[in-house]
Amino acid sequence: MSEKSREYYTIARDLMPGGVSSPVRAIQPYPFYTVRGSGSRIYTVDGTELIDCCGAYGPLILGHACKPVGDAISSALDDGWLYGTPTPAEIDLAQILIADHPSIEMVRFVTTGSEATMAAIRLARGYTGKSDIIKTEGGFHGAHDGVLVQAGSGCTTLGQPDSAGVLSDIVRHTRQVPYNDTESLISLVDKSGDEIAAMILEPVMGNIGPVLPKPGYLQEVRKITAEHDILLIFDEVITGYRVGIGGAQKLFGVTPDITTLGKIIGGGLPLSAFGGKRKIMELIAPAGPVYQAGTFSGNPLSLAAGVAALREIHARKGMYTLLDTATTVIGEACQGKGGSFVKLGSMFKFFFRSSVPENYAQAKESDTTKFRAFWEKMLEKGIFLPPSQFETNFLSAAHSDSDVEYLSSAYASCLSA
């Protein structure tokens, strides 16, 4: 894309594995390097302006450099940026999260989504006294050992759904079922339910698509897990505040036992959380025997950004309706283009397969060669999409009507070429 980016990548490959800090960023033959983001745009080292439909893989629902969030960060910086003590901002953000999620009565802040899901699983095991967990095939719940089994996101992009270095003694405690398949779930829990502490589930599979739940699927999962005394963990790191205030659990009317949140709740800074019923959460140290800790957990800068972002989201009445309308317009431009368009609110994707995928196996049938050619054409038109068939596209409140019109036109022309 630019000579400067090529030069940077040449240097970076000698300094960092693959030249990047996260695998999906290693766009071939070399990634472009970004120096600035503003609104719906990012800008490369050469000054190239791109309409951004990646949004840092989900956190930036308000767009880049949202002023109220930036102002909150600047104000917090004036007071120092790390104390190692509790802060009033922890209470502020906890109150917002609890008010917005009736399933959450207590919350613990951590730094990354991986930490949140790892701690949530540990908590479920500590609460139930059982050893095993269930995840869905292609479900991505971070980069810790117990969930790196047929994982989505960058694992699928690289063709490495199972990671080297993960011990078989660990993953044998991770059972898998296809998404949208309650019969397989029933069969598993009828046989092994006494060994299963929790099922961890992306209510909407954001890391292979999105792939949406079939009508009644989430409700049936809730019923099955409850009947077998299995905790239900909703991984809403992506869907939290993305599909609406209250997340997918509110949208679909399903109450999990534990929820993990991330991305949007930090306003673009590193912040995640997990929360749930009081009787479960009170097992977390120092209140209980399930240990979890972190130097940067609940750091003041991220909390300030998170409080500002969520207050701004609450203040923007109609934002989610506008975003839903925008992706509908883009979807209409994709009709009859030889693939399938999937959307939920501001999440969207064009799959290079004839019908909408309902699970991991079907999503993997997409033509990745066609996707790559399409992705390059869109980049030439000044549009940055996540560089994988298996990563969700995101719109933000900063995308204007003219942005949506341009995106729709580009989709139509690039899918026809």
UniProtKB/Swiss-Prot annotation:
GO terms for cellular component: cytoplasm. The keyword Cytoplasm applies. The modification N6-(pyridoxal phosphate)lysine is found at K263. It catalyses: (S)-4-amino-5-oxopentanoate = 5-aminolevulinate. InterPro entries: 4pyrrol_synth_GluAld_NH2Trfase, Aminotrans_3, Aminotrans_3_PPA_site, PyrdxlP-dep_Trfase, PyrdxlP-dep_Trfase_major, PyrdxlP-dep_Trfase_small. Its cofactor is pyridoxal 5'-phosphate. It is found in: Cytoplasm. The keyword Ubl conjugation does not apply. This is Glutamate-1-semialdehyde 2,1-aminomutase. The gene is hemL.
